């Protein structure tokens, strides 16, 4: 298996922008990568304001929104609760099997979870259980501001305790006027967790274009470090890297 599992310290931190941007940059570099968000609550998959639609636009994948996100519900609750209230049951095996189907089309997949690792996800699993099934290296997306050191270090410790590899952290929503504090938080996260912060993605105010996001990802995220993970995974699997 090749790719990344994108998780976060909380909801509304910037996972979708980060996942879509990194996937879009990798596709521009010639990698055959896809995006996958198994469950989405808050919007149905076809809603242009939803995560599946944003992933499609930013990544530039040919797959449709309902293929990127096969299970979606409009109510903005934790996925397990939202599905239960709608009378729907989704099991861990279903979303894992779908992942394996997508791998027939793509060499690598960037998988976005929901909220953080302990979020109730399918009927029988938390987000972290799904991450353990895939065994992809994690990218942890976190806020750059007050409180982020605690949240990020706890997320990394929880992931490591479950045997998962954390490729790095990306602080999303960095404002120029706060960069001194952001840099201090970056250094503290690295010191306390032993995991590198691979990017300080700027805050996007108002409407933004795909081009703006991808250019920012190229400038502010260490894409070459992420490339090393993809290439190493592909070499272990005996598969081509592009």
From Swiss-Prot:
Ranges annotated as spanning the membrane: none
Pathway stated in the Swiss-Prot or TrEMBL entry: Cofactor biosynthesis; biotin biosynthesis; biotin from 7,8-diaminononanoate: step 1/2
Protein residues bound to ATP: 12-17, 51, 112-115
Cofactors demanded by this protein: Mg(2+)
Enzyme Commission identifier(s): 6.3.3.3
Superkingdom of the source species: Bacteria
Keyword vocabulary terms for this entry: ATP-binding, Biotin biosynthesis, Cytoplasm, Ligase, Magnesium, Metal-binding, Nucleotide-binding
InterPro entries: DTB_synth_BioD, P-loop_NTPase
Catalysed reaction, written as an equation: (7R,8S)-7,8-diammoniononanoate + CO2 + ATP = (4R,5S)-dethiobiotin + ADP + phosphate + 3 H(+)
Record: active site: 37
Main enzyme class: ligase
Residues that bind substrate: 41
Family: Belongs to the dethiobiotin synthetase family.
Function text: Catalyzes a mechanistically unusual reaction, the ATP-dependent insertion of CO2 between the N7 and N8 nitrogen atoms of 7,8-diaminopelargonic acid (DAPA, also called 7,8-diammoniononanoate) to form a ureido ring.
Oligomeric form and interacting partners: Homodimer.
Xref: HAMAP family: BioD (MF_00336)
Name assigned to this protein: ATP-dependent dethiobiotin synthetase BioD
Organism whose genome encodes this protein: Bacillus cereus (strain G9842)
